[in-house]
């Protein structure tokens, strides 16, 4: 079975982000209801615990086969959250059956949201649309940014072709839009991936 990835049915797996000026804590939770496992993003008042900014919002994951899933038992959100210039960034790794053909699909996602209205998802980036690994785990470390607001993440071992698949790479994105603007991939990425020593 797939018990090695869990079982993870509920809780918070990543480091939340606290926006001190607005007194807001942003976090992602995994919940289980009616045999479905769902991830949700929350904005909470740090003084009262009450929801803010149209939260919680159910997270969804678009696949290359044009279907979108919200029941994602194998999706894990381990990477620390980041908020920059009123945009919230969340990264994921998943091991989920692709709805197109039910093969076990493994890839990473980065999603950006309007931090003042979590019902507004701004962009989604999928690291390996072919489902050939490349999840975003980062050993729980957070998403990084530079002084210009560009966003940086590292993908795990996976397929790389420099076109649509970006496993085993460090990726640089434009703010908000998640447009991929640069990346680094080691020359021996295939060896590192196949030997699981990335």
Regions from the language model: what does each represent?
Residues 1-198:
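Mobile, glycine-rich extracellular loop/lid and propeptide segments
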């Amino acid at each position: 079975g797939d018990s090695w990835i869990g079982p993870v049915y509920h809780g918070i797996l990543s480091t939340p982000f606290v926006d001190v000026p607005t007194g807001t804590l942003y976090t992602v939770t995994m919940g289980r209801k009616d045999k479905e496992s769902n991830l949700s993003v929350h904005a909470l008042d740090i003084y009262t615990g009450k929801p803010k900014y149209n939260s919680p919002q159910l997270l969804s994951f678009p696949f290359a086969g044009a279907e979108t899933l919200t029941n994602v038992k194998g999706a894990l959100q381990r990477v620390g959250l980041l908020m920059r210039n009123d945009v919230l960034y969340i990264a994921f790794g998943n091991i989920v059956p692709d709805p197109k053909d039910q093969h076990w699909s493994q890839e990473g996602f980065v999603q950006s949201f309007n931090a003042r209205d979590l019902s507004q998802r701004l962009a989604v980036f999928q690291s390996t649309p072919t489902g050939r690994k490349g999840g975003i785990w980062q050993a729980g470390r957070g998403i990084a940014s530079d002084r210009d607001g560009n966003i940086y993440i590292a993908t795990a071992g996976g397929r790389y072709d420099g076109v649509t698949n970006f496993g085993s790479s460090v990726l640089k994105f434009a703010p908000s839009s998640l447009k991929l603007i640069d990346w680094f991939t080691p020359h021996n990425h295939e060896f590192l991936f196949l030997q699981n020593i990335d």
